[in-house]
């Protein structure tokens, strides 16, 4: 046996064997006793020729989920390595004499001096439709007790984002089912829209309602309308993930969803890896001409996990002790969301990253980084949430930079001025509390603003189709709710939608099929609204 620079070469001694006999024999014939030594010699020589070199190293130090290894001189960045205890790790720091490796398991099972061997595989995960309806960990292993995942296709978690030429501009709407978002902050397929806010302001609720809203299209046979969803839970409680899975099952939405869970009890490397794994699973749909949605909930916990790993690997810290490449961490992840051109399959991958702020501070390091990478943000405020305005969207700070090109034309017709009007209303309302003597115009702005705010409220788990949203917003914008008391606006909505389904089915059908509020459809809608208000 030879050993040099961490390389182990196994040699099988060939001794005591007689020279081979060059006698041709058919495979069907029985071997003669004199031929047995030559057959054995050939097989032993063949086994020696097929013997491979196995590169191994030894653990120098272990602690805090980080192992320093010597001997793996040819290991690749982000390659999987396997410890003799069965634990797997990923090589991150490639130094002159040692390799810094993060562990995907309990570091108490690893000992100093333990043998580590290369796998010659960069970290990858299973992909494909077989994962739909399953809950997996950051390495793609099932954790839902439903047995192994039957797929042979695998994909690297770290892949280069599509270039400029394969992409096309965002042009198809991605409906969330929430009136406030679909009207004022529209999202298109292939867009990156950030959901940002303090804890307990309804960030996950928006993402979950978006997944539930697509049941109406995923139950149809039209593949171009379907949206396959990947929900990545990073650093969340296991009970929260279990509730989310249960809610998806109750609403028959788990069948087109994949849950990637790296909960708070998982190690930092798994929390760092989970968003990349979820992205790789979503990319499979994008690259096969389908449409995918990935929710990263949330990226601030991924950044904290990456900071922990980097500091333990002794990488130099920067602002807020994050490493210098934390911007690149998120940009390389979010750039993989794209709308592909028809020449490249026409698929899309939409990203909804979530960032948790501290005390509403959007000027912190990670929030500003992700705001600059994404195509817009939905900003949620604790103050609005506790006032009962849910979803608690701050209209002034929320924006969609590319989604307006993908917005349904009927929605654009009725909701074109609603964002500006609500921003003016909030400004006037802040001054109105100091003075009681208001002119008629200001009073009208306040009254209509109150009703529009009430109209845009929406309970959780009740997404609306666009053909139901358009008539409701039309009522608010055109002043049909001005005579209705503010506390009866919600009652109006609950009664108007069923009435519209029965008496205005052709109006809803026209909006759904044409996507435009034509003159004829608008006249019919006015008649239905007036008829309903006469008996309300």
UniProtKB/Swiss-Prot annotation:
One of its GO terms (cellular component) is proton-transporting ATP synthase complex. It is found in: Mitochondrion; Mitochondrion inner membrane. One of its GO terms (molecular function) is ADP binding. Keywords: ATP synthesis, ATP-binding, CF(1), Hydrogen ion transport, Ion transport, Membrane, Mitochondrion, Mitochondrion inner membrane, Nucleotide-binding, Transit peptide, Transport. Pfam families: ATP-synt_ab, ATP-synt_ab_C, ATP-synt_ab_N. Mitochondrial membrane ATP synthase (F(1)F(0) ATP synthase or Complex V) produces ATP from ADP in the presence of a proton gradient across the membrane which is generated by electron transport complexes of the respiratory chain. F-type ATPases consist of two structural domains, F(1) - containing the extramembraneous catalytic core, and F(0) - containing the membrane proton channel, linked together by a central stalk and a peripheral stalk. During catalysis, ATP synthesis in the catalytic domain of F(1) is coupled via a rotary mechanism of the central stalk subunits to proton translocation. This is ATP synthase subunit alpha, mitochondrial. It comes from Schizosaccharomyces pombe (strain 972 / ATCC 24843) (Fission yeast).
């Amino acid at each position: 046996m030879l050993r040099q620079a961490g390389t182990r070469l196994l040699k099988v001694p060939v001794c005591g064997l007689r020279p081979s006999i060059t006698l041709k024999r058919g495979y069907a014939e029985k071997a003669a006793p004199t031929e047995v030594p030559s057959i054995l010699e050939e097989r032993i020589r063949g086994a020696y020729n097929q013997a491979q070199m196995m590169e191994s190293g030894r653990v120098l130090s272990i602690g805090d989920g980080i192992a320093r290894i010597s001997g793996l001189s040819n290991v690749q960045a982000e390659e999987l390595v396997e410890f003799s205890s069965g634990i797997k790790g990923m090589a991150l720091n490639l130094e002159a004499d040692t390799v810094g490796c993060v562990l995907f398991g309990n570091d108490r099972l690893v000992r100093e001096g333990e043998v580590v061997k290369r796998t010659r595989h960069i970290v990858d995960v299973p992909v494909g439709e077989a994962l739909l309806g399953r809950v997996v960990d950051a390495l793609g292993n099932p954790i839902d007790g439903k047995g192994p995942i039957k797929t042979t296709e695998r994909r690297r978690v770290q892949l280069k984002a599509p270039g400029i030429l394969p992409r096309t501009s965002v042009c198809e709407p991605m409906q969330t089912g929430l009136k406030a978002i679909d009207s004022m902050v529209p999202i298109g397929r292939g867009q990156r829209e950030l959901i940002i806010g303090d804890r307990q302001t309804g960030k996950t609720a928006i993402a979950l309602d978006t997944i539930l809203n697509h049941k109406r299209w995923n139950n149809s046979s039209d593949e171009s309308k379907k949206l396959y969803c990947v929900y990545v839970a990073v650093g969340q409680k296991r009970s929260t993930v279990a509730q989310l899975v249960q809610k998806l099952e109750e609403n028959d939405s788990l069948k087109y969803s994949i849950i990637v869970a790296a909960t708070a009890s998982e190690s930092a490397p798994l929390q760092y890896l989970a968003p990349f794994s979820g992205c790789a699973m979503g990319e499979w749909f994008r690259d096969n001409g389908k449409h995918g949605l990935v929710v990263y909930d949330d990226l601030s916990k991924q950044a904290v996990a990456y900071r922990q790993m980097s500091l333990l690997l002794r990488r130099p810290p920067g602002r807020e002790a994050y490493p210098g490449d934390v911007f690149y961490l998120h940009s390389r992840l979010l750039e993989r969301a794209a709308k592909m051109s028809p020449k490249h399959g026409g698929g899309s991958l939409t990203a909804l990253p979530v960032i948790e702020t501290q005390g509403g501070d959007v000027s912190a390091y990670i929030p500003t980084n992700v705001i600059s990478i994404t195509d817009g943000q939905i900003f949620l405020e604790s103050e609005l949430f506790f006032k009962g305005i849910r979803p608690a969207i701050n209209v002034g700070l929320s924006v969609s930079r590319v989604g307006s090109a993908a917005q349904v034309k009927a929605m654009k017709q009725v909701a074109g001025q609603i964002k500006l009007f609500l921003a003016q209303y909030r400004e006037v309302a802040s001054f109105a509390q100091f003075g009681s003597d208001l002119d008629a115009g200001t009073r009208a702005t306040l009254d209509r603003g109150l009703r529009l705010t009430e109209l845009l409220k929406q309970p959780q788990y009740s997404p609306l189709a666009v053909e139901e949203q358009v008539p409701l917003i039309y009522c608010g914008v055109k002043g049909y709710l001005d005579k209705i008391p503010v506390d009866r606006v919600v009652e109006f909505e609950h009664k108007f939608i069923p009435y519209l389904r029965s008496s205005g089915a052709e109006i809803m059908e026209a909006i759904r099929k044409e996507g435009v509020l034509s003159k004829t459809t608008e006249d019919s809608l006015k008649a239905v609204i007036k008829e309903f208000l006469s008996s309300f």
